[in-house]
Design a protein with these regions (language model features):
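Alpha-helical transmembrane segments
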Residues: 28-56, 277
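Transmembrane alpha-helical interface segments in multi-pass membrane proteins
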Residues: 264, 276, 286-331, 348, ...
């Protein structure tokens, strides 16, 4: 009986292809949009990811995200270092600056000031150069994508000179940093050098990054810092998630992408449900013949679900392959770094595809169960 079900399914190739494309389109749209969404919001906490040595971030109590910063007083660093449970604490500077590109154009960029002594705050992956050269006057490191955008068409090299806020900056290292949400150009320099580039006032320390001592958890040390200093202290994962939550709650990105995903699901249900119903309707006489020769309703239900399962499996595979190829191809572009297809998104889209197929099968099932075997002998 199941071989008969397959022959019925593959006999009408046009409807089979239409059913497969309906599931594939829905799967592709869900995976592509959710993959982009996760890649976008992940960029919100990129600065935290680039400081893997620290597991605690300390900031002004009013800070809500990584982009709206209220500077701390220099004396706060000593207070944090004196809190029991803190192994070390160093300053971190973050600010937006204007850079003049190689062709004379102005670009907005991100400037990160790392600790002068330890250089904590610099991304761990150095593509070119020596990080010790950052201790030279006017020395900066630049992200790989930032170099390509500032010096378009030039091979990656050291020694290039840029103007940050009309001050001289010499590239001594190329680093691989995490893609940022607001800027694709990121410069790194010593904390003291960063203050010279910006000169934003007396208090310029954006954050204090710290490491917990002993066997104490970052959450426990953070609570201790907050209790003793009055500053806001959070573990690195918590602060990164807070930055992501800010983007989710204060931008239109979730609504925009969520609408597209919902439309993809609704279109999938409508197209697959309608076409599968038409497929069953056109094969109603075949089901009537099977019923006339004694095939049970349970066996007929199994045949319909087998047909639906084959359509769902093929359609989901095609859609998932298309989404994977999209991210593989688009990921080669420097501006699309950090976007990927998480396994849980693929698994979730599989569940959605299965739900679409089950709904389509249930919608068509009534015709099969109540078909009159006598129609075989009519007209």
């Amino acid at each position: 009986m199941f071989s008969i079900a397959m022959k019925m399914l593959f006999h009408d190739r046009a409807k089979f292809v239409g059913l497969v494309l309906g599931v594939a389109f829905s799967t592709l749209l869900i995976n592509q949009q959710l993959g982009i969404f996760i890649g976008l919001i992940s960029r919100a906490g990129a600065v935290v990811v680039d400081v893997p040595e620290a597991d605690i971030w300390v900031m002004d109590p009013g800070v809500k995200n990584l982009d709206t910063i209220f500077p701390l007083r220099d004396t706060e660093l000593g207070r944090v270092r004196g809190v029991p449970g803190v192994a070390w604490a160093v300053p971190l500077f973050k600010s937006n600056v204007t850079i003049r590109t190689g062709n004379g154009e102005l670009e907005a960029s991100l400037l990160i000031g790392v600790d002068d002594t330890t250089l904590i705050g610099l991304p761990p992956q150095i593509l070119m150069g020596n990080i010790d050269d950052l201790r030279r006057p006017d020395a900066v490191a630049v992200s790989e994508e930032g170099f390509r955008k500032v010096w378009r068409g030039q091979p990656i090299s050291l020694g290039n000179v840029a103007e940050l806020n009309d001050r001289r900056a010499v590239v001594v290292a190329i680093v691989k940093d995490s893609p940022k949400f607001t800027s694709s150009i990121t410069f790194f320099t010593r904390y003291s050098q960063a203050l010279q580039y910006t000169n934003n006032g007396r208090n310029q320390m954006s954050f204090i990054v710290a490491k917990g001592a002993g066997d104490q958890t970052p959450e426990a040390v953070s609570a201790n810092i907050t209790a003793r200093t009055g500053l806001k202290a959070m573990s690195s994962p918590a602060f990164r998630w807070k930055a992501i939550e800010y983007v989710i709650h204060n931008t239109g990105i979730p609504i925009s992408i969520g609408t597209v995903v919902a439309l993809g699901i609704l279109v999938g249900i409508a197209v697959v449900g309608l076409m599968f119903n038409l497929f069953v309707l056109e094969n109603l006489k075949q089901f009537a013949v099977l019923k006339a020769i004694g095939t049970s309703n349970l066996r007929l239900i199994g045949m319909v679900f087998l047909q639906a399962a084959v359509v769902g499996f093929v359609g989901f595979s095609v859609g998932l392959f298309g989404a994977t190829m999209f991210f593989e191809t688009a990921g080669k572009s420097p501006t699309f770094q950090g976007f990927f297809l998480p396994w849980y998104v693929a698994a979730g889209s599989g569940a959605v595809a299965a739900a679409i197929i089950v709904l389509a099968a249930l919608f068509a099932m009534r015709r099969v169960l109540f078909v009159d075997p006598a129609i075989v002998f009519r007209g």
